[in-house]
Amino acid sequence: MDGIKYEVFTEKSIRLLENNQYTSNVESGSTRTEIKHWVELFFGVKVIAMNSHRLPGKGIRMGPIMGHTMHYRRMIITLQPGYSILTLIQKRT
């Protein structure tokens, strides 16, 4: 799926699953409306709210030159009650 890179599983994101909120990293150039459309179309759910913040890239030294990795955007997607994204809450082995 274009735009969504991968799901995030941190302590906070696991806690947010109880409130029907899912966390994922997306491409930094994607807009909220694009991500909302992709999630509703791909997973067949109804999105009621989206929060996002941009995370900074990490610094990388290449000899005397200091570079950095690309920054990315993290989205917290809230679904309507009764909807869930089953592929994200299954236990991975």
UniProtKB/Swiss-Prot annotation:
UniProt-annotated location(s): Plastid, Chloroplast
Annotated keywords: Chloroplast, Plastid, Ribonucleoprotein, Ribosomal protein, RNA-binding, rRNA-binding
Family annotation (SUPFAM superfamilies): Ribosomal proteins S24e, L23 and L15e
Chief place where the protein resides: plastid
GO BP, sorted A to Z: translation
Pfam families, A to Z: Ribosomal_L23
One Gene Ontology CC term in the entry: chloroplast
Gene3D superfamilies found in the cross-reference section: 3.30.70.330
One annotated GO molecular function: structural constituent of ribosome
Top-level taxon in the UniProt lineage: Eukaryota
Keyword Zinc recorded: no
Role this protein plays: Binds to 23S rRNA.
Family: Belongs to the universal ribosomal protein uL23 family.
Assembly: Part of the 50S ribosomal subunit.
The protein, known as: Large ribosomal subunit protein uL23cz/uL23cy
Species of provenance: Liriodendron tulipifera (Tuliptree)
